[in-house]
């Protein structure tokens, strides 16, 4: 389990680093409003990744509960972005998907041989 927790921590850290870098780039290239929309989505994605990790941790238990709360998080973010005039929908959505960058990073790190992995 220690290896799983280390992986979970790494994924959260990489997601957070990507969030900070992309937030700065969006703020520089667009506006603070767009960057704030991105940041809201990215924080939602970070929370989603954490919830997903907790769900994976519970695999094998007898409880059969589907990811309703994770889906609800995504729906609330999108509805909030669509209804609130200060938020932009696309940056919120793309911000939410930022956690995928950490998953891609991990996959590439696992597949591409390096001096550490050899």
Curated annotation (Swiss-Prot):
Q: Which domain of life is it from?
A: Bacteria
The UniProt entry, under Pfam families, shows:
CGL160_C
Q: What Gene Ontology cellular-component terms does the record carry? A: plasma membrane; proton-transporting ATP synthase complex
Q: Where in the cell is it found?
A: Cell membrane
Q: List, in alphabetical order, the GO biological process terms annotated in this UniProt record.
A: proton transmembrane transport
Q: Indicate the transmembrane segments per the record.
A: 11-31, 73-93, 94-114
Q: How does it sit in the membrane?
A: Multi-pass membrane protein
Question: Which keywords appear in this protein's UniProt record, sorted alphabetically?
Answer: Cell membrane, CF(0), Hydrogen ion transport, Ion transport, Membrane, Transmembrane, Transmembrane helix, Transport
Alphabetical list of InterPro entries matching this protein: CGL160/ATPI_dom (IPR056309)
Summarizing the function annotation, the protein's role is:
A possible function for this protein is to guide the assembly of the membrane sector of the ATPase enzyme complex.
The similarity comment for this entry is:
Belongs to the bacterial AtpI family.
Q: Which PANTHER family match?
A: NF-KAPPA-B INHIBITOR-LIKE PROTEIN-RELATED (PTHR34118), PROTEIN CONSERVED ONLY IN THE GREEN LINEAGE 160, CHLOROPLASTIC (PTHR34118:SF6)
Name of the protein in question: ATP synthase protein I
Q: Which gene encodes it?
A: atpI
């Amino acid at each position: 389990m220690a290896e799983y927790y280390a992986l979970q921590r790494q994924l959260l850290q990489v997601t957070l680093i990507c969030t900070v870098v992309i937030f700065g780039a969006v703020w520089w290239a667009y506006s603070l409003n767009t960057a704030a929309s991105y940041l809201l989505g990215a924080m939602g994605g970070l929370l989603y990744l954490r919830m997903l990790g907790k769900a994976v941790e519970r695999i094998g238990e007898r409880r059969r509960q589907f990811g309703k709360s994770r889906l609800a998080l995504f729906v609330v973010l999108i509805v909030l972005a669509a209804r609130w005039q200060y938020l932009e929908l696309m940056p919120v959505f793309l911000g939410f998907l930022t956690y995928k960058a950490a998953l891609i990073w991990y996959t590439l790190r696992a597949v591409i041989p390096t001096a550490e992995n050899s």
